[in-house]
C-alpha cells in the first residue's frame, strides 16, 4: 500500500501493517488509523512480512471473533513483531490482554484510534501503552485522514457511532459507547470526496442507521440525510442496519424519490416470535415486523430485503422456532444471515435460564439455512431472462467478469458472474457498470453474458 503524502512529518523508520478482524465499522477505524500513520510519516505496508509493527484491529462481538483476534495477536507476537491491539477486544479486555499476553506493546480503544500515531511514538520509546478511554466518545469526520482502497470501488461511510439501545444479547453499547452522529454537512462532504476518488458505491453504516441524528438534531434525521446525499454524484448509495422503528414514511419516500439510493433494506430483525423478542429486550419489534415488511413491498415493489437472525436464544422453544420458519416462508427475504446465540459476559442474556443446547441450536441454524436457500434460489431465478445493471469489480481465474447488481451487497450476498467475448480487454471493464443478460441462477449467484458498458 506504501502511500506517499506530501503533507507528512519527517519519515519514520518503523514500517507498520494492519490486521483487521470484524465488521465494516471496524474496517473504517482501520482505514482511519492507516491514514493517520501515513500522514505522520510512517510507512504503512500492505504486506505484514515487511513490517516490524503490526496493529491488530480486533472484534469482540462473539466468541469466534475473539478467538480469531487472539490467534492473530499470537501469530504476530510469535514472529517477533511489535503488536498493538486496537478495537473492541482492547476496549473489552484491556487488563486481561496485557496480563495474559505480555508481549503486547500497546492497546488502543474504540474511541481512541485517532491517537494511533502518538501510541506508536510511545511504543517506539519502549513504553507499554494503554490508551483506552472508559467511555468511547470520539467519532471521526471528513477531516481525519483515511485510506480507502479505490480498487474496490466501494466505500463504507459511517454516519454515527455507538448505540443507546440495550438489546439483551449485545455487548456493543459497552464497547462503542453511546450514539454520536456526524452532521449532515460532514457526511455529505465525505461522500463528495469519495465520489471524486472514483468510488461507485457508498454504504451508510452505524449501529442503527435509522436512529441517525437523534442525538444532535433531537429526532431521527435519516430521511433528510438521504435527500442531501441523493444530490452527490455516486451511482449507488446503500443503507445497512435499518431498524423497523425508524423506517418512517419519510425514509421510505426518500428511497422512492432518489435515483441513486438503491432499494435494498438491511433489517437485523433477529427473531419473529414476541416471546423471544421480549427476552431479547426488543418487545416493540414484534408488532412492527409484519407491517413494515408489507409496507416496503407495497411502496417499493423492486425492494430487496435482507435480515439477520439469532437461533438458540435462551428460552427459544420449538414453537418459537417454528414461528420463525413460518415467518421466513411468508415474507421470503432475498438474503438471510443466521447466527447461533453467543452468551456474552456483561450482557443481560448471559445469565438467562433455559439455555438451548448447542446441538439443538446448530440444527436450527442448519434448518434456517436450508429453508432460505430454497427461497433465495427462487428469488434469483426470477431474474433469469432479464437485463440487469452490474458493477464489475474483478476478473475470475476463468476470465469472467465478477460483479454485483444492486440486490447484492458486497461481502455478505452473492455475485454476478459474466462471460464476455475473448476479443475484449477485460481490465477495461473493472470499476464500470455494464448491462448484462442473466441466463442462469443458483441460490447464491447470478450468471449471464455482458452486453455493453453503460
Swiss-Prot record:
Function per UniProt: Catalyzes the methylthiolation of an aspartic acid residue of ribosomal protein uS12.
Cofactor(s) this protein cannot do without: [4Fe-4S] cluster
Annotated residues for binding of [4Fe-4S] cluster 1: 23, 59, 88
Primary location group: cytoplasm
PANTHER family with a match to the protein in the record: RIBOSOMAL PROTEIN S12 METHYLTHIOTRANSFERASE RIMO, RIBOSOMAL PROTEIN US12 METHYLTHIOTRANSFERASE RIMO
Broad EC category: transferase
Residues reported in the UniProt entry to bind [4Fe-4S] cluster 2: 163, 167, 170
Subcellular location(s) of the protein: Cytoplasm
Protein name (database record): Ribosomal protein uS12 methylthiotransferase RimO
Domain of life: Bacteria
Catalytic activity from the UniProt record: L-aspartate(89)-[ribosomal protein uS12]-hydrogen + (sulfur carrier)-SH + AH2 + 2 S-adenosyl-L-methionine = 3-methylsulfanyl-L-aspartate(89)-[ribosomal protein uS12]-hydrogen + (sulfur carrier)-H + 5'-deoxyadenosine + L-methionine + A + S-adenosyl-L-homocysteine + 2 H(+)
GO CC annotation, single: cytosol
EC nos: 2.8.4.4
Bound cofactor: record note: Binds 2 [4Fe-4S] clusters. One cluster is coordinated with 3 cysteines and an exchangeable S-adenosyl-L-methionine.
One MF annotation (Gene Ontology) recorded for this entry: 4 iron, 4 sulfur cluster binding
Entries under PROSITE patterns matching the protein: MTTASE_N (PS51449), MTTASE_RADICAL (PS01278), RADICAL_SAM (PS51918), TRAM (PS50926)
Gene: rimO
Amino acid at each position: 500500500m506504501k502511500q506517499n503524502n506530501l503533507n507528512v512529518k519527517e519519515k519514520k523508520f518503523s514500517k507498520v501493517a494492519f490486521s483487521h478482524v470484524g465488521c465494516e465499522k471496524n474496517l473504517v477505524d482501520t482505514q482511519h488509523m492507516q491514514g493517520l500513520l501515513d500522514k505522520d510519516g510512517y510507512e504503512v505496508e500492505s504486506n505484514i512480512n515487511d513490517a516490524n509493527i503490526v496493529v491488530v484491529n480486533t472484534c469482540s462481538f462473539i466468541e469466534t471473533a475473539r478467538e480469531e483476534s487472539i490467534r492473530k495477536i499470537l501469530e504476530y507476537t510469535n514472529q517477533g513483531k511489535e503488536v498493538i491491539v486496537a478495537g473492541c477486544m482492547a476496549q473489552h479486555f484491556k487488563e486481561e490482554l496485557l496480563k495474559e499476553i505480555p508481549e503486547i506493546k500497546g492497546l488502543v480503544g474504540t474511541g481512541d484510534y485517532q491517537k494511533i500515531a502518538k501510541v506508536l511514538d510511545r511504543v517506539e520509546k519502549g513504553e507499554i501503552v494503554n490508551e483506552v478511554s472508559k467511555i468511547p466518545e470520539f467519532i471521526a469526520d471528513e477531516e481525519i485522514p483515511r485510506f480507502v482502497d479505490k480498487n474496490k470501488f466501494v466505500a463504507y461511510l459511517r454516519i454515527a457511532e455507538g448505540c443507546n439501545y440495550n438489546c439483551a444479547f449485545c455487548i456493543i453499547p459497552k464497547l462503542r459507547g453511546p450514539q454520536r452522529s456526524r452532521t449532515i454537512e460532514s457526511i455529505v462532504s465525505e461522500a463528495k470526496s469519495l465520489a471524486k476518488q472514483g468510488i461507485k458505491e457508498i454504504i451508510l453504516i452505524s449501529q442503527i442507521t435509522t436512529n441517525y441524528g437523534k442525538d444532535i438534531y433531537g429526532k431521527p434525521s435519516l430521511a433528510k440525510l438521504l435527500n442531501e446525499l441523493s444530490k452527490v454524484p455516486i451511482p449507488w448509495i446503500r443503507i445497512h442496519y435499518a431498524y423497523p422503528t425508524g423506517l418512517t414514511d419519510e425514509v421510505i419516500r426518500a428511497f422512492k424519490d432518489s435515483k441513486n439510493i438503491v432499494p435494498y433494506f438491511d433489517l437485523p430483525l433477529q427473531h419473529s416470535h414476541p416471546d423471544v423478542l421480549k427476552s431479547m429486550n426488543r418487545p416493540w419489534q414484534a408488532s412492527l415486523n409484519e407491517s413494515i415488511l408489507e409496507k416496503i413491498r407495497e411502496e417499493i415493489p423492486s425492494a430487496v430485503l435482507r435480515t439477520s437472525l439469532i437461533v438458540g436464544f435462551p428460552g427459544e422453544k420449538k414453537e418459537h422456532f417454528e414461528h420463525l420458519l413460518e415467518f421466513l416462508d411468508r415474507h421470503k427475504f432475498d438474503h438471510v444471515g443466521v447466527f447461533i446465540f453467543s452468551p456474552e459476559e456483561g450482557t443481560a442474556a448471559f445469565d438467562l435460564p433455559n439455555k438451548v443446547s448447542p446441538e439443538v441450536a446448530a440444527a436450527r441454524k442448519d434448518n434456517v439455512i436450508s429453508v432460505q436457500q430454497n427461497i433465495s434460489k427462487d428469488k434469483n431465478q426470477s431474474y433469469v431472462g432479464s437485463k440487469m445493471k452490474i458493477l464489475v469489480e474483478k476478473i475470475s481465474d476463468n476470465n469472467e467478469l465478477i460483479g454485483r447488481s444492486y440486490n447484492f451487497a458486497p461481502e455478505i450476498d452473492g455475485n454476478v458472474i459474466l462471460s464476455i467475448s475473448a476479443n475484449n480487454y477485460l481490465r477495461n471493464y473493472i470499476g464500470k457498470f455494464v448491462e448484462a443478460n442473466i441466463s442462469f441462477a443458483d441460490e447464491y449467484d447470478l450468471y449471464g453474458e455482458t452486453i455493453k458498458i453503460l
